[in-house]
Amino acid sequence: MPNDPPPAYNSHPFNVVIFGESGVGKSSLVNLIAGSPLADTSPDAAACTFASRPYHVVLESCKAYCIWDTIGLNEPEISREDYLRAIKHAYKLIKDLERSGGIHLLLLCMRGRITKSVQQNYRLFVNVLCEKKIPLGVVITHLENEPSMDGWWIANERVFKSYGIATNGHACITTIPGIDGVFKDRKEESREKMRDLLLELTMPTSEGWRRESARTWFTDLMGGMMKMLPGRSRRPTNKELMEKLVRECGFSRKDATAIAGSIEVIREQPESESGSETSGSDDGGS
């Protein structure tokens, strides 16, 4: 169960953050990697961005992983309400990652189209949360009916490049449970692909990345996320931010005031060139 205490390790496990839209199969991917039903695969309509659950998995040679099943953005645009709901989950995720050794790997889980939501998730997790410091693996799900699952990547790799989505590895898979043995071979193939991808992208000498403090990391994340709000939307006020920071994150009013002010400063900074890397005009993929 996700709330059970983690196993004891001689050192921190590799922290792998899986992110993507709801319904793409993130929880099923956790179960595929683990080889057992660790994660609940039923949809959670009330899920908020950055809400996460850790699952502990040991692969070959006793290589330990903590897989963070993380809620990403489900809409092409972030709303003011989405932003405010995400605050407590973002702070908890960052605190958990900071004290457990940082992030070693990001996995973008998606279906076979690069939607606006996929682009926004890439920007939020790769550019903002991890400042492009972390390897990214892309996992394409729901490919069980393709003539060749790997053939999908051959046909669509150029689309990722055209959207500025830089990957360090990929896996074209299915996570479908299967009925009466249907897709059994493809699911076994998919499990091997995922384990190979994890082992390839987390070398024994890999060190987790994190900012100098959880507070700085959190402040920069929420400032970067604030910049992603549409220009026409009403932004959260300093008072609203402060109330959330005090009530849901446990900051003192003095600290909450300082953090809210820093978020506003970040929001006012000019957009860097990297901010438009995934600004394709149409959905991509087949």
Report residues per predicted region:
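Conserved GTPase G-domain substructure that encodes guanine base recognition and part of the catalytic core
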Residues: 1-286
